[in-house]
């Protein structure tokens, strides 16, 4: 994601414009998780979009490759993946907004506390929505440098390209660093980007503290079943399976991990069938814990390249048996992913009804919009600050979940 400062205003009020810029800076400073991201939407794409709706990003089809001179053209299958459009806001009276004319006082008493609070709420939601969108998992009994190495290696096995970032709980990073802080290689650019949360580079990944990461508690052993619907060719041979994005079972919780006993393996982003096992991670569950959403799995039969696949199975295998990978207990959760796997865009949505005197500021790719509203009941004006954005991991192959036993 490009990092830059820019200001656009609908008024000539320099003071308001400067204030919004300070708030935008305070928000951007707290969003470490999305600093490593790429843009997937343009301002034009945001036109007419509403908060809470989803936007489709398309995963390109790499097609199939044949050896020799004979060509065998195949259809192009672009896969849609949803990115949610969201908004976070904070508001205050115009008196509170205008009370502090001195920029330093305004920064300390308004921009920084409100910007930080807004940003942390926003960041926590983005983290919770995306930390389990992974196709691989590394599970360990204790924090160690080996955990960081294993997670980076899992990505390397898929030959993913680009910058790799690692987000772990500060407690986890503290325990790892106690075993040899000198193992972290400092990087000037990353230090400037992530500030005090940056530890250094290890195993090819920038290591970053993230206090907003969740924990996962397994109270009762979860069980799960996955239903596969075959896709047939003209001769009734199974060449793949319809996309799967749900599982059923018992004691399901967000973050639960299941394996398929080596029967389900990853097709990497270049279309190569790898030997890396797919780990199925629960994204969300129904209240009873009997049905769960998972990252979409597009399965092809070995050598068939059906439906822009991200996973493959051997011919003749048409069922999968899932086994829980997590024992009963509580786990710290971390994530190692590529910068390119996270899409983040923040632009000015359509104006809200009844608003006026709008100012917009962008810092670090994060846009903050200020609007004023009349409060007819109390005969006063309100200042509202909005951060409209779209964020999401659009391809789970670019991310690895890390589970470290806490208790």
Where in this protein do the model-derived segments appear?
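N-terminal "assembly arms/tails" that initiate or stabilize quaternary assembly
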Residues: 1-80, 399, 403-405
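Short, Lys/Arg-rich flexible segments
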Residues: 2-41, 93-105, 119-139, 391, ...
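Hydrophobic, glycine-enriched assembly/anchoring segments
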Residues: 5, 92-95, 366-407
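Long, contiguous amphipathic alpha-helices that act as assembly "spine/axial" helices in icosahedral shell
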Residues: 57, 81-147, 153-172, 195-206, ...
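Autoprocessing Asn-cyclization modules and mimics
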Residues: 174-297, 403-407
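A sequence-level detector for low-complexity, Ser/Thr- and acidic-rich stretches
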Residues: 214, 225-227, 231, 267-273, ...
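Short solvent-exposed strand/turn elements
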Residues: 286-321
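C-terminal hydrophobic structural anchor segments
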Residues: 329-366
């Amino acid at each position: 994601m490009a990092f830059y400062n820019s200001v656009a205003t609908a008024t000539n009020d320099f003071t308001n414009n400067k204030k919004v810029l300070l708030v935008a800076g305070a928000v951007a400073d707290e969003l470490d998780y999305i600093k490593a991201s790429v843009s997937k939407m343009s301002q034009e794409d945001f036109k007419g979009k509403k908060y809470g709706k989803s936007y489709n990003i398309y995963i390109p089809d790499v097609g199939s490759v044949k050896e020799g001179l004979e060509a065998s053209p195949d259809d192009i299958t672009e896969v849609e993946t949803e990115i949610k459009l969201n908004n976070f806001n904070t508001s205050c009276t115009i008196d509170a907004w205008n009370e502090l004319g001195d920029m330093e006082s305004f920064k300390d008493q308004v921009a920084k506390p409100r910007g930080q609070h807004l940003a942390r709420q926003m960041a926590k939601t983005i983290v919770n929505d995306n930390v389990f969108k992974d196709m691989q998992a590394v599970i360990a009994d204790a924090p160690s440098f080996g955990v960081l190495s294993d997670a980076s290696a899992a990505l390397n096995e898929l030959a993913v390209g680009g910058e790799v970032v690692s987000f772990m709980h500060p407690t986890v990073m503290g325990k790892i660093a106690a075993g040899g802080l000198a193992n972290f290689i400092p990087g000037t650019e990353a230090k400037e980007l992530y500030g005090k949360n940056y530890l250094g580079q290890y195993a090819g990944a920038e290591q970053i503290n993230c206090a907003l990461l969740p924990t996962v508690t397994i109270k009762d052993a979860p069980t799960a079943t996955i239903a596969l619907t075959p896709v047939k060719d003209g001769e009734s041979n199974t060449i793949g399976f319809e996309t799967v994005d749900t599982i059923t079972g018992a004691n399901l919780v967000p973050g639960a991990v299941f394996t398929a006993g080596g029967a389900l393996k990853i097709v990497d982003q270049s279309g190569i069938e790898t030997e890396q096992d797919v780990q199925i991670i629960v994204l969300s569950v129904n209240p009873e814990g009997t049905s769960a959403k998972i990252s979409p799995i597009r399965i092809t039969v070995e050598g068939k390249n059906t439906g822009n696949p991200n996973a493959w199975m051997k011919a003749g295998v048409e069922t999968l048996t899932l086994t829980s990978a997590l024992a009963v207990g509580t786990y710290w959760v971390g994530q190692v992913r590529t910068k390119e796997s996270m899409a983040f865009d923040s632009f000015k949505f359509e104006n809200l009804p009844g608003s006026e005197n709008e100012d917009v500021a962008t810092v670090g790719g994060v846009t903050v919009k200020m609007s004023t509203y009349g409060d007819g009941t109390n005969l006063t004006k309100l200042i509202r600050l909005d951060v409209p954005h779209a964020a999401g991991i659009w391809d789970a192959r670019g991310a690895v979940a890390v589970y470290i036993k806490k208790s």
